[in-house]
């Protein structure tokens, strides 16, 4: 069949149906969302949980959510901008920070449901394959599915760093090692040590050392915040180890104190009857004084 030009006549415009708003804005992949949201019909009121990961220019957002007609309900959330509290003050959007954010989300969620002592996850980080399995006689492992949004799911993407952090934190998320750093597509083999290096920020540390030797100015420009916070390449692994331990120790979100806002009034308030009478009396007195002065002169 040859090329057929779309005739945009009256019938075309009369029958035209716009796409969903979030599709028009390029924010939601509804093909993927349909498959992530629709639950098995024999599970009735059981929600299907998603682990949502979004990477922005300055932050990494991780959420556990489920869909309702009114909109998505957020069960738990963790953000990379919370990491300075746990000792990671720089590089809040790299792979290591994504892992920490995923770990924080998992520990926070399990703590909220009282399952943090039952499902400890992978305490010793080795970068290898790990899957959470339900324990007999205990509540089942919390299962959810990765929602990567419109991110390109290539090998080594930060989205999978957050996934690995959540799995090591004790959540059951179906996954394979094919998208983790260290997987070789040609030999079909996964090198866990390479993955561990990324989790511990050693790829960043190696680049820091390289720039130090090759181009001092580029190093100062690229890693200005690291220099400001006295973070050296040799300190990186220890910094992330301490952060992982601190997250496991206290993952609870601390609410910020509510800021008291003093209301300002820009227009004049209405005068009461007593104030109006007093104002009239003052004007009368002022007028009489002016009359007296005029008579005297």
Curated annotation (Swiss-Prot):
A single Gene Ontology CC term:
presynapse
**Glycyl lysine isopeptide (Lys-Gly) (interchain with G-Cter in SUMO2): where is this cross-link?**
220
Q: Which residues carry this modification: N-acetylglycine?
A: 2
Q: Where, per UniProt, does this protein localize?
A: Cytoplasm; Nucleus, Nucleolus
Q: Name one GO biological process term.
A: translation at postsynapse
Q: Which residues carry this modification: Phosphoserine?
A: 185, 272
- Gene3D superfamilies, per database record: 3.30.420.100
Q: Where is the composition biased (Basic residues)?
A: 258-268
Covalent cross-link Glycyl lysine isopeptide (Lys-Gly) (interchain with G-Cter in SUMO1) as placed by the record, residue numbers = 220
Cited InterPro entries: Rbsml_uL18_euk, Ribosomal_uL18_C_euk
Q: Which UniProt keywords apply?
A: Acetylation, Cytoplasm, Isopeptide bond, Nucleus, Phosphoprotein, Ribonucleoprotein, Ribosomal protein, RNA-binding, rRNA-binding, Ubl conjugation
CDD domains attached to this UniProt entry: Ribosomal_L18_L5e (cd00432)
User: Could you cite one Gene Ontology molecular function of this protein?
Assistant: 5S rRNA binding
Functional summary from the UniProt entry: Component of the ribosome, a large ribonucleoprotein complex responsible for the synthesis of proteins in the cell. The small ribosomal subunit (SSU) binds messenger RNAs (mRNAs) and translates the encoded message by selecting cognate aminoacyl-transfer RNA (tRNA) molecules. The large subunit (LSU) contains the ribosomal catalytic site termed the peptidyl transferase center (PTC), which catalyzes the formation of peptide bonds, thereby polymerizing the amino acids delivered by tRNAs into a polypeptide chain.
Q: What subunit structure does UniProt give?
A: Component of the large ribosomal subunit (LSU). Part of the 5S RNP complex, which is a LSU subcomplex composed of the 5S RNA, RPL5 and RPL11. Component of a hexameric 5S RNP precursor complex, composed of 5S RNA, RRS1, RPF2/BXDC1, RPL5, RPL11 and HEATR3; this complex acts as a precursor for ribosome assembly. Interacts with NVL in an ATP-dependent manner. Interacts with RRP1B. Interacts with IPO5, IPO7 and KPNB1; these interactions may be involved in RPL5 nuclear import for the assembly of ribosomal subunits.
Q: Which family does it belong to?
A: Belongs to the universal ribosomal protein uL18 family.
Q: What is this protein called?
A: Large ribosomal subunit protein uL18
Q: Which organism is it from?
A: Mus musculus
């Amino acid at each position: 069949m040859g090329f057929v030009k779309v005739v945009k006549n009256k019938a075309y415009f009369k029958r035209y149906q716009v796409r969903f708003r979030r599709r028009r804005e390029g924010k939601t992949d509804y093909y993927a969302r349909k498959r992530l949201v629709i639950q098995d019909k024999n599970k009735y009121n059981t929600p299907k949980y998603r682990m949502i990961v979004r990477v922005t220019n300055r932050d990494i957002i991780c959420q556990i959510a489920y869909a309702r007609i009114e909109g998505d309900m957020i069960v738990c959330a963790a953000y990379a901008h919370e990491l300075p509290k746990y000792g990671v003050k720089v590089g809040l959007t790299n792979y290591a920070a994504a892992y920490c954010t995923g770990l924080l989300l998992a520990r926070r969620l399990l703590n909220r449901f009282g399952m943090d002592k039952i499902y400890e996850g992978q305490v010793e980080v080795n970068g290898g394959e790990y899957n959470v399995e339900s324990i007999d006689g205990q509540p089942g492992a919390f299962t959810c599915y990765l929602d990567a949004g419109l991110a390109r799911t290539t090998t080594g993407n930060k989205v999978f760093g957050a996934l690995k952090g959540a799995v090591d934190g004790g959540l059951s998320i179906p996954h394979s090692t094919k998208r983790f750093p260290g997987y070789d597509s040609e030999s079909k083999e996964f090198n866990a040590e390479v993955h561990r290096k990324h989790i511990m920020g050693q790829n960043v540390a190696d680049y820091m050392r390289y720039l130090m030797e090759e181009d001092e100015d580029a190093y100062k420009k690229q890693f200005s915040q690291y220099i400001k916070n006295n973070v050296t390449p040799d300190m990186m692994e220890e910094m992330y180890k301490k952060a992982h331990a601190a997250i496991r120790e206290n993952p609870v979100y601390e609410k910020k104190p509510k800021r008291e806002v003093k209301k300002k009034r820009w227009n004049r308030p209405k005068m009461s009857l007593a104030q109006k009478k007093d104002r009239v009396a003052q004007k009368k007195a002022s007028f009489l004084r002016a009359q007296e002065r005029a008579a005297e002169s």
